[in-house]
Amino acid sequence: MPSVPAIWPADDSRVVMVPPSFDAPTVIRTKRDGGRLSDDAIDWVIAAYTDGRVAEEQMAALAMAILFRGMDRTEIARWTAAMVASGEQLDFSDLPMPTVDKHSTGGVGDKITLPLVPLVAACGAAVPQASGRGLGHTGGTLDKLESIPGFTAALSAARVREQLRDVGAAIFAAGALAPADAKLYALRDVTATVESLPLIASSVMSKKLAEGAGALVLDVKVGSGALMASEAQCRELAHTMVELGSANGVRTRALLTDMNSPLGATVGNALEVAEALEVLAGGGPPDVVELTLRLAAEMLDLAGIGDRDPAEALRDGTAMDRFRRLIAAQGGNLSAPLPVAAHADTVTAARGGTMGDIDAMAVGLAAWRLGAGRPRPGVSVQAGAGVRIHRRPGEPVAAGEPLFTLYTDTPERFGAAMAELDGGYSVGPVAPATRPLIIDRIAE
């Protein structure tokens, strides 16, 4: 199997040997008791889980043990390599343009991929974007794009290559790439193991290493709406992923970005597609535009075409044209109306004042309750469900004015969604302190 280089020295003092016969209970017990899994144990458990010899409940137990006990960097490197080896690996080195990709660790209202991918393609790079579905309270790019009538994310490797040549970009389901991660990703979503740093790092990097891009920019979210709220943990995650990428010949860089408040004014699937179209048309919320342009600049720099101005591609319409071509190439119809939820309800201000902080986690959970996310793997999301934010932190609010509009096809969900929002915002006499959107940059 192709291996991720052991870029960190192994510490064998905590190795608990797994017998050569290998069985899931022994592997689980090893990690439960604080031991370090050997390379052979990791190779076996990933292969066995992929082909069904390790049951879902057994992998759930192992994931929980990893959440509580952690992994050292040698284990993370091997776990990542095993997931890469579980499926197909793409190679775009023969394309006439540089390849670069972006990955976000997940946030609330994070629709950045939608304008970013065509924007970077319009500036001359090829962007092979293997994306995922919603995870926990965070939205998924594929769920958003599939709210566009006719859009398909199921592309073969040959079709991805053809589309990169013709359009310069493709946004697709990982499919045969790292199938072990696809199974584990869905399992983590429903077993409260989303927040494990080793599992986040290996999940992201296994797909990205298998994807074959020459460069990668990571958007590591920090704050209440991120998969991990602690800035220290997010820094460790960013450094781990940058080192994994660089050790495997992928030029990798990370931005730490704020996710204490939702990005933009919408959280949901079709709602976020509509907002992404506003950005591509030269408008859109300032925070979405700022982060899109900054990530585009980083991607173009790593691709060796940093002299291109992504803001110009937004202004002159070339990014919008590239998005339309991308959607059409994947069967989507942007001329058809986006789905609209059957029911809406509004949260209004009880008093006047200034909008305080809006908690990203509260809004993300409200959207999830409304049907924008899924309670278990295989459940369909509601394309039109979600939350629209009418007042951003620091903006003036009048008594009785709408603050949020909630959308769903099933009105009995409103109560639970409003309960999630309750306490997640405030209106008071003083504007909240402002936070920088971009916290730090971590390079190779």
Per-region residue spans from a language model:
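Glycine/serine-rich anion-binding loops at beta->alpha junctions
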Residues: 98-121, 125-138
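Well-ordered secondary-structure scaffolds
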Residues: 22, 26, 31, 36-39, ...
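Short beta-strand segments
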Residues: 130, 164, 172-174, 219-223, ...
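Alpha-helix C-terminal capping segments
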Residues: 68-69, 115-128, 207-212, 247-248, ...
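Acidic, glycine/proline-rich low-complexity segments that act as flexible tails and inter-domain linkers
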Residues: 4, 8, 14-109, 122, ...
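Phosphate/diphosphate-binding glycine-rich loops and adjacent basic-rich segments that engage nucleotide
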Residues: 165-213
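A glycine-rich helix N-cap at a beta->alpha junction
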Residues: 144-170, 239-245, 249
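Active-site-proximal beta-alpha loop/turn segments in soluble metabolic enzymes
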Residues: 63-66, 144, 181-190, 219-228, ...
